[in-house]
Amino acid sequence: MAVIISSKVLLIQLFVLVLGSFSKLSHGELWLELPLPFDWPPAEIPLPDIPSPFDGPTFVLPPPSPLPSPPPPSPSPPPPSPSPPPPSTIPLIPPFTGGFLPPLPGSKLPDFAGLLPLIPNLPDVPPIGGGPPVNQPKPSSPSPLVKPPPPPPSPCKPSPPDQSAKQPPQPPPAKQPSPPPPPPPVKAPSPSPAKQPPPPPPPVKAPSPSPATQPPTKQPPPPPRAKKSPLLPPPPPVAYPPVMTPSPSPAAEPPIIAPFPSPPANPPLIPRRPAPPVVKPLPPLGKPPIVSGLVYCKSCNSYGVPTLLNASLLQGAVVKLICYGKKTMVQWATTDNKGEFRIMPKSLTTADVGKCKVYLVKSPNPNCNVPTNFNGGKSGGLLKPLLPPKQPITPAVVPVQPPMSDLYGVGPFIFEASSKMPCDKN
């Protein structure tokens, strides 16, 4: 049972060693400063003797030689890459078929005292068949770290570069890839392995002779710069009056007509007052016109005198009305017992009144039958408008209506006796 546990511990230590080698490679050249597990002194661990299944020679792996530190960068060409370390001889190991790895014949178990600090403290593992747990051995104090000696400085110093001929900067030397770490040995190393001396420094090449110095070439003078005109300040902005946008005219909306309220079902009964008497409006003046006038008869005593002295009204005298317009109109009239005549033209309008005249035609009295030209009895008398009668000051209950037509007057006209007729002076 103890052999199975020790084999498990050995496998765990080998796994930790492989992980440590990969972590050192991932962190650059840190492995150069830390000691390798092969440099630690061996420690003896009492283990029971295990019969080896086969006998064979014992192979010892030499420790890897440390790589030389890279030289400082210089303008000289990069040094040649260091020679790779000699290949290590790896013993032939039979294939692992299961169980634990048996040691080689004639070899001793490796010293695990130096590897114990790299292994975490594992808890007590109880055996498979039962029983108290087997305690692992406590690690011993590690040995002090041994740093490799630094490489000796190169005896030849590079000469300073030529200042006249400037060379382009050399690229930084490429780091050589570190060789992969050797696989973990199966057998323990010898108690005092011999360290190989560091390789000799690479040869330093002498600097190449500087080329012949050429006379410095003079560069042509730069062309004169054109004088820039002084920058004038920008003119002040012109203050334009604000543009007033015309307000949109209100849309001509049709007037909203409120609907008439519907009449109630049973409207209230409102007593009606008696309507006042309707008074017919007065007819307009000028429809139809009426022409009136008087006719007189003058005695022989006042012959040739154009007055109404000693004149009397003449009944039965004939007069005529002649209107000159689009259509000529002639109407006749006879005086009454008061010597007055009235003519009512049928188709006469107010506009045609100024184109009408009245003439004397004949007299019924043979002693007074000569018409005179008094007021145009012979040449025609013009119509003159007459004013309607005035209303009384205290009107009666029923007002007096004005005449229904326009009144026009002519004359008066006079008939006289003939001059051949003897006149009685009595």
Swiss-Prot record:
Residues 1-23 form the signal peptide. Glycans are attached at N310. Residues 69-182 are annotated as: 4 X 5 AA repeats of S-P(4). The keyword Glycoprotein applies. This is Pistil-specific extensin-like protein. Sequence repeats lie at residues 69-73, 76-80, 83-87, 178-182. Coiled coil: none annotated. Pistil (stigma and style tissue). Residues 60-94, 123-161, 168-224, 231-254 have a biased composition (Pro residues). It comes from the Eukaryota. GO terms for cellular component: cell periphery. It holds the Pfam family Pollen_Ole_e_1. PANTHER family: OS01G0164075 PROTEIN, PISTIL-SPECIFIC EXTENSIN-LIKE PROTEIN. Keywords: Glycoprotein, Repeat, Signal. Disulfide bonds: none annotated. Residues 56-109, 121-254 are annotated as: Disordered. The keyword Glycoprotein applies.
